[in-house]
């Protein structure tokens, strides 16, 4: 492994387009050979409302709102978010984001995780 790596998030595959219309999700972890961190970019269209959330067994995440506004739901708490807000989420907390009228763009930084991942879907959680 090299001592450094570089990748452009917008040049990576959109991993969400088949799952949610208009949502853009790009994950850099496997492209930068990081042992301890993952970086992802999420873009939600205006007024996007999720139905599902997710949690993790081990992985802590920090989300930075790069643009737009919306809401974040953390377990049963819902908070407004706007540009440059930073939200830290413990692994077991179920989380999800909804976009406001101006859409929502996030950068997520994630800690260590098991090799196979540790995401836990929460289906129909935000309905």
Q: What are these model-derived regions, one by one?
A:
Residues 65-66, 73-75, 98, 107:
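Beta-strand residues in well-ordered beta-sheet regions across diverse protein folds
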Residues 58, 77, 93, 102-103:
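A generic "binding-loop/recognition-motif" signal
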Residues 3, 96-127:
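Double-stranded beta-helix
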Residues 41-45, 55-73:
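Short, conserved beta-strand element in jelly-roll/cupin
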Residues 1-37, 46, 52, 118-127:
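A short, N-terminal "cap"/entry segment at the start of jelly-roll beta-barrel domains
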Residues 76-92:
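Short acidic-glycine-tyrosine-enriched beta hairpin
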Residues 52, 72-73, 89, 94-101:
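Short beta-strand His + acidic residue motifs that chelate non-heme Fe in jelly-roll/DSBH
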């Amino acid at each position: 492994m090299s001592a450094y790596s570089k990748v452009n998030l917008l040049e990576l595959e959109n991993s969400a387009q088949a799952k949610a219309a208009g949502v853009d999700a790009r994950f850099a972890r496997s492209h930068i050979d990081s042992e301890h961190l993952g970086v992802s970019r999420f873009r939600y269209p205006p007024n996007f409302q999720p139905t599902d959330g997710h949690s993790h067994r081990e992985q802590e995440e920090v989300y930075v709102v790069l643009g737009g506004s919306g809401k974040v739901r953390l377990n049963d708490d819902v908070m407004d978010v706007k540009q440059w807000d930073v939200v830290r989420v413990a692994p077991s907390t179920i989380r999800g984001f909804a976009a406001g009228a101006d859409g929502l763009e996030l950068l997520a930084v994630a800690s260590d995780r098991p090799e196979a991942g540790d995401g836990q879907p929460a289906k129909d959680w935000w309905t």
